[in-house]
Amino acid sequence: MADLKPYIAKAASGEPLSLGDAKAAFDIMMSGQATPSQIGGFLMALRVRGETVPEIAGAVASMRSRMIPVIAPDDAMDIVGTGGDQSGSYNVSSCTAFVVAGAGVPVAKHGNRALSSRSGAADTLAALGINIEADADTIGRSISEAGLGFMFAPMHHSAMRHVGPSRVELGTRTIFNLLGPLSNPASVKRQLVGVFAPQWLEPLAHVLKELGSETAWVVYGDGLDEMTTAGTTQVAALENGQIRTFEITPEEVGLRRCSPAELKGGEAAENAKALLGVLEDKDSAYRDIVLLNSGAALVVAGKAENLKDGIAQAVQSIDSGAALAVLQKVIAVSNDKPA
């Protein structure tokens, strides 16, 4: 039986683990060969020292090797946040996913139940009538027929059950908060990823590059794990093998700046109603932040030349009813009915 103890000692001494060592350590944990105490000790040793790019990449490689995969087109993308920003905001990435799919980009959306908000992606999508526990074949069909499929993380990463109890008992952020957005079961190569703190922007962009992503924007929106219309968004963009950083304000792309209070969400039913309102073309601060994130996603997907062009395409996706049609098709296909 493999032993986690040498890796705990290495991490606790402040020594960084190589990608190979990190993968080996996570393989031990994810296969049920470590005790809850060992898992907790290892995770906190990494957290206190600060997780490195090779360690995150090794952990993701371990998760990806065990996941139940979903078949998606080569040009599919994911739009996802780490959660953990404590903002209680609307489900921006979920709504953005429908708008982007309505603009013609296949979306393989990976998500979970609430972490920092009162309603996570899975909670809100379930409230809209989507079967979040659909099997991999049904999700693949949803992506090809509706343009979007939702992959509920626990259904695809069952090995996480071995680390779940330790995470709950620790009650604080660990490396696993960073791994979900990097472990998409459809192995997409294009991502818009939101992070809960700005220090993770460049490291996660480097991890995505290390793991084979072609284009990605890692974003932090002034307290939100997405691009924001309530302040300045910081971006680390992976494009053509290079990583560059820049900032974006809503005004420079023609959007109204709002107050953080205007982006506050509620329970799943309330968030579902608000999401539907955006897709039904009701003007709101929520619509504006979705347009900003959709514009960025369309740039990442290679569908838009720049952010303003992407936002214009996002407006068209909503105004034409295409985004709402995607939602209706996903509800039908996920429940195994004709689209």
UniProtKB/Swiss-Prot annotation:
This is Anthranilate phosphoribosyltransferase. PANTHER family: ANTHRANILATE PHOSPHORIBOSYLTRANSFERASE (PTHR43285:SF2). GO terms for biological process: L-tryptophan biosynthetic process. Pathway: Amino-acid biosynthesis; L-tryptophan biosynthesis; L-tryptophan from chorismate: step 2/5. GO terms for molecular function: anthranilate phosphoribosyltransferase activity; magnesium ion binding. 5-phospho-alpha-D-ribose 1-diphosphate binds at residues 81, 84-85, 89, 91-94, 109-117, 121. Anthranilate 1 binds at residues 81, 112. It comes from Brucella suis (strain ATCC 23445 / NCTC 10510). Its cofactor is Mg(2+).
